[in-house]
Amino acid sequence: MEKKIWYAPNGFEAYGDEEINAVNRCLREGWLAGNGKYTTQFENEVASYFGKKHGLFVNSGSSACLLALASLNLPSGSEVITPACTFSTTVAPIIQLGYKPVFCDVELNTYVASAESVISKITPATRAIMLPNLIGNTPDWKLIRKMLDDTSRTDIYLIEDSADTMVCTPQTDISTTSFYASHVITACGSGGMVMFNEPKYLKRATMFRDWGRIGDNTELVVERFNHSVDEIKYDYKFLYACLGYNFKSSEVNAVFGVEQMKKLPKFVSIRRQNVERYLENLKDVKGIVLPSDTKNSNWLAFPIQVEDRLSLVNYLEDRNVQTRVIFSGNITRHPAYREYLQVFPNADTIMRNGILLGCHHGMTIADVDTVCRFIKEFLNLDISRVQE
């Protein structure tokens, strides 16, 4: 049987003794609840990598997206522009917070929205643009920022959902990312971060993350009891200003992430080599749509499109190559989002034909060559044989 080629890093492909030793050190030090020195270090390092001043470590990228929007305190019914080809928890917070998603299509080969398609959706009710760096490819944030600035609409925020990758995007107002186990780096299998330049948005996001409370981590009684409720002096660690959540993560997750950040350049380099190998191997193969690669992309996985997707999926999976579809395709066709149903030609094509293949840092060039060999074999076969 062929070696299993996973869609995402599996087991010790993702971590090693460095992370294990760091976690053990953290456990021996005895502080688990988060907001400790490792959380602070991790927040600072990731925020700096993204070109932001402040980071807030949370339990998932999905939570980070919700906090990104919640921190802005937009008027009810505000419109938020977002692509139809996406991930569910890029869109869900828009609706959960009482806003209206306004969908646009994506480009067929990049899987992200063009600047023109985004800006064309702006109306007087638009208050935010929330775009994913889908599969690790990035929209043209510089052009989007320029075109937005040209509209003189200073009341529209740019939010990037960078769950799938790690990039520097100073053009955006808010960035989010995810440290789920399958991503470019992981914080012990989970975690996320929301990043800001403005302290006021960080403060509000922190309140939402920490149960809605006003207080921070100080133990100074003079600060804790410097608030009153109906003339009752009250500890602001238990004084609630908004309807919050518990989206906190732990020091164990943070220290794991700190070690992963040291490996990020290596992980990115391996992924880049694997993507370039795919592109070289498949460039002359008919019947397959390859992604447009800008060299700035830091791909989570390698996307392709073929007309008979299910047959190719079966062919690859039967040969121990794990596959995925390209996330939502057109998310307005999904049961939870049917009230927004629209035809988006490119997102619909991706929904029918899209496949994700592994390109992660646990894979070798030989693994990529094996996957490409199977794809070529499949495309040279009579389809009826594959479906038997």
Named regions from a protein language model:
Residues L32-E79, P93-L97, F103-D105:
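Phosphate-binding glycine-rich loop
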Residues C85-V91:
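Conserved coil-to-alpha-helix start sites within the AMP-binding
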